[in-house]
């Protein structure tokens, strides 16, 4: 899986928008109906729909509560202080990226938000890398459990995880083989 597929999956998450148009007809989708829309009345729609409406200037995107600078600072502090990965909202990085890219004028202090999200990603990436290194240093095979990993992180760590799996197979074969 790559970043584009992760964003595609995250695009089905619901987000609040304030429509600037009124339309009494709901939009019928496979996943369910969205709408009707009334100008100025907030409603929740999939992120991908919000981005399409935003591009047509038909709505204002309401950033999720966790996308506030103070909330992001709390998340960064939690990530820094905890040994493991902190629990994040579903599709945190993908939704952040899509909104910063496509709805930046609707995000308060967008540059600070972008910087904090990147800092959180970097901290988590460093933790994942150091965990993989520690796992590979072990002399015996065992299982690893990764809690609170985001889909995009698992996707980007796939090569490292595959290397760990192959290393485990090599170690197992070494212990199971008999000398000639």
From Swiss-Prot:
Pfam families: PSF2_N, Sld5. The keyword rRNA processing does not apply. It comes from the Eukaryota. Keywords: DNA replication, Nucleus. GO terms for biological process: DNA replication; double-strand break repair via break-induced replication. The keyword tRNA-binding does not apply. GO terms for cellular component: GINS complex. Component of the GINS complex which is a heterotetramer of gins1, gins2, gins3 and gins4. Required for correct functioning of the GINS complex, a complex that plays an essential role in the initiation of DNA replication, and progression of DNA replication forks. GINS complex is a core component of CDC45-MCM-GINS (CMG) helicase, the molecular machine that unwinds template DNA during replication, and around which the replisome is built. PANTHER family: DNA REPLICATION COMPLEX GINS PROTEIN PSF2 (PTHR12772:SF0). This is Probable DNA replication complex GINS protein PSF2. It comes from Caenorhabditis elegans.
